[in-house]
């Protein structure tokens, strides 16, 4: 398993290189920095949850590839991520079981289905930015990115959607709740100030 974890680091570097070299320059939000952050959070949360080794391997693979589909097809990032998982994992010596479980985790992350602890950890790793002090800057980057990729929405409507999302979102693991830097109410207030 130690060797596989080292191999996952190689996969992470490969995906980050793809973001840096092949991705559209206007991926202001879905970028190498966010991939690194999701991978780090998945690592931290899986260790805190004391997941079995095989679950950690599959979770880390899913974290690496979760956003990779944005490189090839912004409108269908899930499809792109799944294709990349199927293509790259055999090249790196991972089993069909790893491929299927990584794909399941990624699909569940995109549709918001949280059946297992690994699903919950990937969810919390993906949305960790909602509790960060630089949330406003990140949500602004997401708005710019989506606008340039065809989102028809003015800033005020966008901010209302973000407020609603913040209020309805919940971290699913105790560790993620504990690590949250900024409470929901403060983020919503910050959005209101930003809006005015």
Regions found by a protein language model. Name each.
Residues 92-98:
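P-loop NTPase signaling cores
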Residues 29, 68-76, 93:
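Short coil/turn segments at secondary-structure boundaries
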Residues 16, 39-43, 86:
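Amphipathic, well-packed alpha-helical segments that form the structural scaffold of globular domains
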Residues 38, 76-92:
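An active-site-proximal "capping" alpha-helix that borders the catalytic cofactor pocket
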Residues 38, 54-73, 81, 103-110:
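His-Asp-centered metal-binding catalytic motifs of divalent-metal-dependent phosphohydrolases/nucleases
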Residues 23-55, 65, 94, 111-196:
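Divalent metal-dependent phosphate-bond-processing catalytic cores, especially two-metal-ion Mg2+/Mn2+ enzymes
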Residues 2-21, 34:
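Short alpha-helical hairpin
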């Amino acid at each position: 398993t130690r060797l596989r974890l080292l191999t996952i680091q190689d996969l992470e570097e490969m995906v980050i290189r793809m973001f840096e070299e092949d991705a559209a320059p206007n991926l202001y939000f879905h970028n190498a920095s966010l991939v690194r952050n999701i991978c780090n959070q998945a690592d931290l949360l899986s260790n805190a949850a004391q997941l079995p080794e095989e679950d950690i391997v599959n979770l880390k693979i899913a974290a690496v590839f979760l956003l990779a589909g944005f490189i090839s097809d912004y409108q269908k990032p899930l499809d792109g991520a799944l294709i990349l998982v199927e293509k790259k994992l055999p090249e790196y010596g991972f089993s069909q079981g790893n491929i299927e479980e990584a794909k399941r985790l990624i699909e569940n992350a995109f549709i918001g289905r949280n059946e297992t602890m690994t699903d919950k950890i990937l969810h919390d790793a993906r949305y960790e930015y909602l509790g960060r002090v630089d949330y406003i800057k990140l949500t602004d980057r997401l708005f710019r990115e989506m606008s340039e990729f065809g989102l028809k929405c003015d800033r005020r409507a966008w901010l209302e959607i973000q407020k609603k999302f913040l209020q309805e979102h919940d971290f699913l693991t105790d560790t993620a709740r504990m690590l949250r830097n900024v409470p929901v109410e403060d983020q919503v207030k910050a959005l209101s100030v930003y809006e005015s």
